[in-house]
Amino acid sequence: MMASKTPEGSLTNSSQSMSINTLADQVSSSLSFADPSSDGKTGNSKINEQGESGKSSTCRPSTSSDISDESTCSSFSSSINKPHKANDVRWEAIQAVRTKHGGLGLNHFRLLKRLGCGDIGTVHLAELNGTRCYFAMKVMDKTALASRKKLLRAQTEREILQCLDHPFLPTLYSHFETEKFSCLVMEFCPGGDLHTLRQRQPGKRFTEQAAKFYVAEVLLAMEYLHMLGIIYRDLKPENVLVRDDGHVMLSDFDLSLRCTVSLSIVRSANVGSEGLSKNSVSCSQQPACIQQPSCISMAPTSCFGPRFFSSKSKKDKKPKTENGNHQVTPLPELVAEPTGARSMSFVGTHEYLAPEIIKGEGHGSAVDWWTFGIFLYELLFGKTPFKGSGNRATLFNVVGQPLRFPESPVVSFAARDLIRSLLVKEPQHRLAYKRGATEIKQHPFFEGVNWALVRCASPPEIPKPVDLEALNPTPTVPAAASSSVRSDQSNYLEFDFF
């Protein structure tokens, strides 16, 4: 397996440079018109990099004291810095305990249930003592991390979580250390993950309408990550968790890559002009909502009656010009894609690996758009497109076999076209290679989606309430990520021939 190299990504062909955090906050806040309540994981085998990777930070530089300094973390993980969670009572509960006891530790939590086990830690459902506030706590054995050279990966995940403030990304409430463990206190999603939810659907696949809902929310989360210079590298249904309100949240950032990125605003072509791209639709103009506060004062039915797709009456339609084209004022497009990032790491899940990772050619942000295509394919068809008889066969299928669609179920041409545009083996020809999520949002598959109000849409399914108080506490904390819990060890492959 190849060791990773420190990537430096940049976006140099911008017409107007903007502050990363400022613009990311604008896009994130455009989804906060409603404030639905929001409260880990099974997994396929991952391929992990052999060594630790150096990563440039877009949030703040790492220091050696970060591993054990909770006060440093708490200054970043607070409701003040995360407006999407500003009214969350869990912030107040955490702060009350911290103020009363001078800090936060494992003894302040009651571990109720093991939710899942990943490569670097075990996730538990935990209750903050005496508060009825529930969290997902990721517990990592520091000795095991050090022996397996995973300390930097754990640190990178924590730093990424500290940076995030988005409706479809996790909230890190706190981080603390014990003599043996490193713990991340995050929000709990009682709806499980999309993999489990898909298994319960007829035919073990989602309808196209349901799939569109989920991938739209994932796309907005990925767009935000790329704005921050974060390449996710681990998108799959197991890592998309379902909140209690039915909306989703990405999880598991231990394979993510951090790089530098420049944000820019570029002028888009007039939608009524002859030079319009065939894949562009009216929703490409949606970023105007970021700049127009009037969007917030829409009629309540637009948000809470909720419709995912717009349905306009004849009198609501936009006026046409003399030649019959709609009058649409050219509006700026947000471009935030770390196109210059490069890594030689061999990481990911076999069925989701992009060809450039397998071939060891070095990869950048385009790998996320490949996995986005695989993700959509799996939601629609109930399986991934290149799965072979074994892991090795799967990898060779990804590199050498063409994309094929099954005869059943029947999906729309737009859905197949989007998947086909994303699953292009040459990354430079892949949809979203240059302009990221902006290109995908303009694809006809998403025609009619009001991107600013996705958060207000009705989810396809609302999880059944879970009686958390009836759960018995976990007697002991297991040695997270130790060899004793790595039951899928045989599924981990190392490749020295790519």
UniProtKB/Swiss-Prot annotation:
Low complexity composition bias: residue spans: 28-37, 62-80
CDD domains from the UniProt entry: STKc_phototropin_like (cd05574)
Subcellular localization, as worded in the UniProt entry: Cell membrane
Every Protein kinase domain range: 109-446
One of the record's GO cellular component terms: basal part of cell
Reactions listed under catalytic activity: L-seryl-[protein] + ATP = O-phospho-L-seryl-[protein] + ADP + H(+); L-threonyl-[protein] + ATP = O-phospho-L-threonyl-[protein] + ADP + H(+)
Gene3D superfamilies the UniProt entry points to: Phosphorylase Kinase, domain 1 (3.30.200.20), Transferase(Phosphotransferase) domain 1 (1.10.510.10)
Enzyme Commission no: 2.7.11.1
Topological type in the membrane: Peripheral membrane protein
Active-site residues annotated for this sequence: D234
Keywords assigned by UniProt, alphabetized: ATP-binding, Auxin signaling pathway, Cell membrane, Kinase, Lipid-binding, Membrane, Nucleotide-binding, Serine/threonine-protein kinase, Transferase
Region (Disordered): 1-82, 310-329
Matches recorded under Pfam families: Pkinase
Binding annotation for ATP: L115, G116, C117, G118, D119, I120, G121, T122, V123, K138
GO biological process: auxin-activated signaling pathway; gravitropism; phototropism; protein phosphorylation; regulation of establishment of cell polarity; root hair initiation
Chief location category: membrane
Domain notes: The activation loop within the kinase domain is the target of phosphorylation.
Assembly and binders: Interacts (via C-terminal PIF domain) with PDPK1. Component of a complex made of PINs (e.g. PIN1 and PIN2), MAB4/MELs (e.g. NPY1/MAB4 and NPY5/MEL1) and AGC kinases (e.g. D6PK and PID) at the plasma membrane. Binds directly to NPY5/MEL1.
Record family assignment: Belongs to the protein kinase superfamily. AGC Ser/Thr protein kinase family.
Role noted for this protein: Protein kinase that regulates the auxin transport activity of PIN auxin efflux facilitators by direct phosphorylation. D6PK-mediated PIN phosphorylation promotes auxin transport in the hypocotyl and this is a prerequisite for PHOT1-dependent hypocotyl bending. Phosphorylates PIN1, PIN2, PIN3, PIN4 and PIN7 in vitro and PIN1 in vivo. Phosphorylates PIN proteins (e.g. PIN1 and PIN2), especially when NPY proteins (e.g.
UniProt protein name: Serine/threonine-protein kinase D6PK
Protein species of origin: Arabidopsis thaliana (Mouse-ear cress)
